[in-house]
Amino acid sequence: ELEELSKQLNDLETGGYIRPSKSPYASPVLFVKKKDGTTRMCIDYRALNSLTIKNRYPLPRIDELFDRLQGSKYFTKLDLRQGYHQIRISESDIAKTAFRSRYGHYEYLVMPFGLTNAPATFMHLMHQILRPFLDKSVIVFLDDILIYSKTLEDHQRQVREVLELLRQNKLCAKESKCEIYQRSVEFLGHRIDEHGLHMMTEKLDAIRDWPQLTKVDDIRSFL
């Protein structure tokens, strides 16, 4: 874990995401396991979050997003590369993001994961940038963007327009996680195609294979 911490700190500093800090703030470091089995360094900002005035910008309801897809036959899914890290922190707020680790005291120059207002801030930015296409040919939830169309010709044009808009705003997508010109895609935990929404097979299997619940805490955890 220490080796992984050292590597991730080095990658963040080399990439220009963090810098050494002399800030009086010093949040602790945590490690979170990702779906692919690797670990991601996160900062425990609970103390800072408790003092933060909350940004009430609403996150969209997933069921309302899916309602927009009726009649669509072509789909493109874009995943922004390290989405939060594409937003710079205001110079006056950089010191507040400082964290301590075994290998030094650092602060973020870009928006880190774990800040209470990070989702609302990112959602607001995405809505501002993609406003011309929202609910017409695009739905977006945080760093996941779905372009949907009824014809291939319209879809190709709309994909080009969205990519150009992202380029103009200096937002980068992660190519390995993008799916272009598809008849079916996975998006926000569902399989989507021209026939509608479908529960993903692995999620159904997980529910079917769940052991019998006998305690209130087990039921609460399942829900």
Regions found by a protein language model. Give the residues of each.
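Retroelement reverse transcriptase polymerase core
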Residues: E1-L223
